[in-house]
Amino acid sequence: MTHAREWRSSLTTTLLMVILLSYMLHLFCVYSRVGAIRIFPETPASGKRQEEDLMKKYFGAGKFPPVDSFVGKGISESKRIVPSCPDPLHN
C-alpha cells in the first residue's frame, strides 16, 4: 500500500507543477506584449507617390518594358526561339 500511496503523491505533485508552470507561462505571454516601434518619415509622401513606391518595391517597375512596346512587333519577336535540333549538352 505504501508504494501506491507514494506513486499517487508523486503524480499529484507532478500534475500540480505542470498546472502551475503552464499558468505562469500563460501570464507571461499575456502581460509581456510589446508594441511595434514605428518610425514615420519627417515629410509624409503623397498618396500617388506612395502607391508608385509600393509598386516599385513589390513589382520592380522599370525592369520590364511596358506592354505597349510589344504592340507593333508581332508575336514571333516576343517569344523565345525554339531550337531546330536537340541540345547535345543536355541529352
Swiss-Prot record:
Q: Mind listing the GO biological process terms from this record?
A: cell-cell signaling involved in cell fate commitment
Glycosites: P86
What GO terms fall under cellular component here?
Answer: apoplast
Signal sequence residues:
1-35
User: Would the keyword Membrane turn up in this protein's UniProt record?
Assistant: no
Hydroxyproline found at: P83, P86
Identify the keywords attached in UniProt to this record, alphabetized.
Answer: Developmental protein, Differentiation, Glycoprotein, Hydroxylation, Secreted, Signal
Entry similarity comment? Belongs to the CLV3/ESR signal peptide family.
- The protein depicted here goes by the name CLAVATA3/ESR (CLE)-related protein 27
Q: What's the name of its gene?
A: CLE27
